[in-house]
Amino acid sequence: RFEYSSSPVTLVAALATCLREVHARYGADAIFEEILRLQDHFLEHLAHPDLKPLRFSRKHRSGILALYCPDLKGCAAALSTQDLICSPRGGYLRVAPHYYNTEEQVEQLAAALNRSGSGNP
């Protein structure tokens, strides 16, 4: 009836460190602003005519950007051969830069999509 278990001490310690070192240091608002800045930088470099970003007003934006891609699975597979992971979900390619990504990294993603937006590497 009762099962012995232990507390996930290591997970609690990891969460505490993450909250202290990241969220307390930078603040959630600053992290979110950096993510949106990187998204905008990515969109400035995205030029493939078949890729259409699903855009929302600033009030309704999130850290996830959805791109319409005619060959969704092929596009995701082509990106994965370049160690760029974007997941196909709900008919869109999910692009989600993190606050620690660099401008160069999102430019690399945009360049790869510009080359392979049709699903070809």
Task: Please tell me what each predicted stretch does.
Residues 1-121:
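Pyridoxal 5′-phosphate
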